[in-house]
Amino acid sequence: MQAEENGNWFADAAEAHVGDQYKFLITTKKGEFSRIDPYAREVTTSVGNAIIHDPGFDWQGDDFHLAPWNELVIYELHVGTFNDQEDVNNPGKFPSVSTRLGHLKKLGVNAIQIMPVGEFAGDRSWGYNPAHIFSVEIAYGGPLAFKQFIKRAHQEGIAVILDVVYNHLGPSDLDLWQFDGWSENNFGGIYFYNDERAITPWGKTRPDYGRGEVRQYLLDNVLMWLEEYRIDGIRFDCTQFIRTINGAGTQDLPDGWSLLQWLNDQVAEKYPGRITIAEDLQHNRWLTKDVGAGGAGFSSQWDAMFVHPIRQAVTTPQDENRSLEAIRDAICYRYNDDAFDRVIYSESHDEVANGKERVPQEISPNDPKGWYARKRSTLAAAMVFTAPGIPMIFQGQEFLEGGWFRDTVPVNWDQNVEFHGIVRLYRDLIRLRLNRDGFTRGLCGQFTQVYHLHDERKVIAFHRWDKGGAADDVVVVANFFREAQDGYVIGFPAAGVWRLRFNSDWQGYSDDFQSHPSSDIVAEAGETDGLPFYAAVSLGPYSVLVYSL
């Protein structure tokens, strides 16, 4: 190989062909080192060889555009377990995920967020141990299968958002580690920090964000996903361990912050309309401020200020111990001026593992498919789809997947049939959230007012709107109590007939739901809850009503 002035090396191999395997042999004073190309688009295994890959692909007919962020509904999934193959010894692959796209389309989601697919050690993993970030996991089908999957998803009207890991690499099967044999303090060498800045919860493998070659490497990776794979958005894992050393915000890492700014700035410049999402969970509003204003420039961020109080509210065994003030704060929390710069959820891969379980399982450990589990988990889901923010659910949540998430246990699709009514409940909520029928535009709007909160009776009501008026104003009333509440008087923002668009107690969702006699109501003049009109509603136990004009 020949050295270039910028520190890069190159070689022309006229006899090389697509599909050929290769490796770099690096000879230094430290010895000889066999290394996989850090930019390899395909590898045989995480410890094998690089493969010469043709990045070309027939994207003809793929003119997909991501929905506006206030109209996104995200479905997080893990390729290896979402729809496992018949061969139980191997993980699921992209083609097996493709066979379930019809389910997702019918459910109504318009974006899939895929847990990391960069080549990792072994065949089964969550994906957060990337060995080769430019190569698609071969056990999932490799790069061609991933492109085919993305094109198929786009044909179904579904965006693909990819989870990437830049807060650390590896730590196992990591050829970048001491790449040329050099290191200090027995750390990672030229591409990593070689002091305490290298230390993360996952190993001493934090890349050196202050090194130009490393920054370019990570930017090139982001741009590869957007260009070669036509990914519609990027979710950045644990950004608190990029912008700080200890993840707690007390040891800032300026190199990491400027890296995030640069990556987001480049995405916005080169691919306007694509979304970038931070998983930071430190309720830091600067993450979603514009780079020009000193922020990191993310489009949105996962919101710990929503998921934790909502889960706490529905998993608390005794009604009297539920905090409606915490629910109110979760509904109303916002980082900056945009209600949709947060992603809200009651389940994610982290929230249903690491010592935690699926919401129905936590509600009723001995009866996770029972009445209490179904009623209160769907109560949480209703909050996800009616509160301001970008709603997200985790694979299998729509049919009461139980236990906790593991990369060796596939989703139980038999429950899709067994709990078809709960699936319909999710489908109806998503339809309302996206205003598919043209009478709930307010759920896509910026404005929210929680105007009624009765902590003793455990009832909360809030108003959502965009511009206001007919087909826009939405009122959500939620009962976090085990008993029905009849003739319950609350305020309404406008007079006239308010149509009942959704009742989570409908028996069509589950045979043992009560179909409590809730109906359209007429709001009459009379100041109530600070609003000029009022009406009496009837709520089933642990139920949500959605009204609109």
Predicted regions, residues:
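Carbohydrate-interacting/catalytic domains
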Residues: 1-71, 80, 90, 95-105, ...
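Short, flexible loop/turn elements at secondary-structure junctions
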Residues: 15, 78-83, 118, 137, ...
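Conserved alpha/beta catalytic core and glycan-binding cleft of carbohydrate-active enzymes
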Residues: 43-53, 230-232, 246-406, 434, ...
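Soluble or luminal CAZymes and related metallo-dependent hydrolases
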Residues: 96, 142-145, 213-218, 255-259, ...
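Short, contiguous acidic/charged loop-to-helix segments that flank catalytic cores in large enzymes
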Residues: 133, 137-141, 209-210, 249-254, ...
